[in-house]
C-alpha cells in the first residue's frame, strides 16, 4: 500500500484505502502512477461538478478516456467528440467500440462549419497554421508577394500590418525574430515569389471545426473543467502552447486539465500493454503513430498518410484529394523547388526561379 505522504491533498474528496487500491491495481508504478494520482484528485475535486472530456479517437485520447472511466467516482465526466465533417470511418467505428467497451455515451458535436465547406469558402490549409494564417491575411489585401522593407510595404498595404511584419521580418523593436517570419522556413519566401498561390489559403477550418464548437459546448453545457489528451513529448503547436498539465482560468468559467501532459511514449506503451487496450484501426491496422485531422496538409508526412488512406479507405482518399488537392500539389512543388536549389538546377543568385 502506498503512503499518503506521497499525495498532494488538493480536494475535499475523502480518499479511502479502497480508492488507492483501485489506482494501484490499474496503474503500474512509475510516471503512470504518479500522474494518475494527480488526475484522480483533479477529477474528484469538489470544485468541479461537470467535466468535459474531449475524445478524438486517437491513442492519447484513448488513454485519457480509460483513466476517466476508472477514476470518475461521482460520474461527473461527459465524453464529447467534435466531428469536423471529415472523419475516418475507422475513427467512427472506434468511437462505437469505446461506447460499448466502457458502457458510456460519447456526445457528437458537429462543426460550426464542416472542413469541406470551410475550405471551399475560406481557403485551404498550407504547410502550417502560422504560414496559412499570414498568407491568408496577405491574400485578403491582394498582396503581390513582393520584396521591400516593412515601412515600404506598409505604404501599399496599410491594413495588413502583422502579416507584413511576418513577410518582411521586421518588428517594432527593430529586431528580426526569425522563428516567426517567413524567412525562418527555408526558401519559402523565394518559392512563393516564384510560384504565387492560385488558390485561397487559410487556417480557418481549425477554428470552425474544432475551436468554436468546443467553446460553444462548454458555455452551453455548464462545464467547469475541460480535459484534453495533450502530451508534452508529442510536440506540435498544441503541446508547445502549454508549460504544465493544468491551467486555472481566471477569465473563464472553466479550468483546463491535461492529465497526460508528462506521460512519455514509454509510459503510454506500458499502460496500453498493462490494460490490454486496443486503439483504432488507424493505429492497429494502418500503422499510424499518431493522428490529427484526417488528410490535413499541415501534416508534414501527409504523403505517407495518403498512401494508407488510399489503401484502407479509398472513398475517403478521393474526398481528401478533392478538398485539399491544391495544397498537396503546392507543397510538393515547394519541396521540389528546395531540391532544385540544393542541386543547383535552380540558380537563386541569377534569379533563375
Model regions and ranges:
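ATP-dependent adenylation/nucleotidyltransferase module used to activate substrates
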Residues: 2-267, 272
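ATP/NTP-dependent adenylation/nucleotidyl-transfer catalytic domains that generate, transfer
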Residues: 3-6, 11-24, 48-50, 253, ...
